[in-house]
């Protein structure tokens, strides 16, 4: 009886904890009619949640243009705006992917790396991507940034194939899975209108600090250089 109650308690805890990775927020506004429409359209014909995840991931990766790669305006943040304008930095693309997945009742969160902007060292910037809960294996990280020469991010669970890896001493791969985007990310995107203006507002944190949604004190002066 005790074992049964313990299992029930754990199941309830996991269900409650997972709810935050399904929630509607100001940024992840998956209740927007166009996001719901697209989420249903992408899911159509796929019989498993894993197949839906793959389809959503590839759609955002390939159909939403990375703001720097294509030098496109405006700078987007909210999921519905990313969809409307079909462009966004890595952070914004992760917001739309999370929205599409949550609209399909698939838990999705946010992950971050600290990377050199030009692979040569300073300046550094955060890089944003997603973690998705797969029923058969748990959390799996994916990067819908967009592929190009030298970048080949794929959905190949259980193997993780991200766009980048932390290699330099001052780079970092933070393991926390956040239910909401970091506030410093949202603020950086909200204060810029153009893709080149955003280059001078790329958010950064100290690599020894595991960032939290309320983290502001570790914000470093943003680099003014090309995006990773």
Describe every region a protein language model picked out.
Residues 17-85:
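Secondary-structure boundary elements
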Residues 52, 56, 86-96, 101:
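Active-site nucleophilic cysteine motif
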Residues 92-182:
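Hydrophobic/aromatic-rich core segments of domains that either
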Residues 172-205:
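Alpha-helical and coiled-coil interaction segments, frequently adjacent to or embedded
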């Amino acid at each position: 009886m005790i074992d049964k109650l313990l299992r029930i308690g754990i199941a309830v805890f996991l269900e409650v904890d997972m709810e935050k990775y399904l929630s509607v927020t100001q940024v992840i506004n998956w209740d927007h009619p166009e996001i719901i429409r697209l989420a249903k359209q992408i899911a159509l014909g796929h019989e498993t949640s894993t197949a839906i995840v793959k389809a959503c991931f590839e759609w955002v990766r390939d159909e939403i243009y990375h703001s720097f790669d294509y030098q496109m305006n405006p700078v987007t943040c909210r999921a519905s705006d990313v969809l409307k304008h079909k462009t966004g930095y890595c952070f914004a693309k992760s917001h739309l992917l999370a929205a599409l997945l949550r609209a399909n009742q698939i838990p999705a969160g946010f992950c971050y790396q600290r990377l050199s902007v030009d692979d040569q060292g300073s300046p550094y910037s955060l890089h944003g991507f997603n973690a998705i809960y797969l029923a058969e294996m748990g959390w799996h990280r994916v990067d819908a940034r967009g592929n190009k020469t030298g970048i080949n991010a794929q959905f190949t669970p259980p193997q993780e194939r991200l766009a980048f890896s932390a290699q330099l001493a001052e780079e970092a791969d933070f393991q926390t899975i956040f239910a909401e985007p970091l506030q410093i990310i949202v603020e950086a995107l909200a204060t810029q209108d153009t893709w080149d203006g955003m280059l001078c507002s790329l958010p950064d944190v100290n690599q020894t600090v595991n960032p939290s949604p309320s983290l502001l004190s570790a914000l470093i002066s943003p680099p003014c250089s090309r995006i990773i």
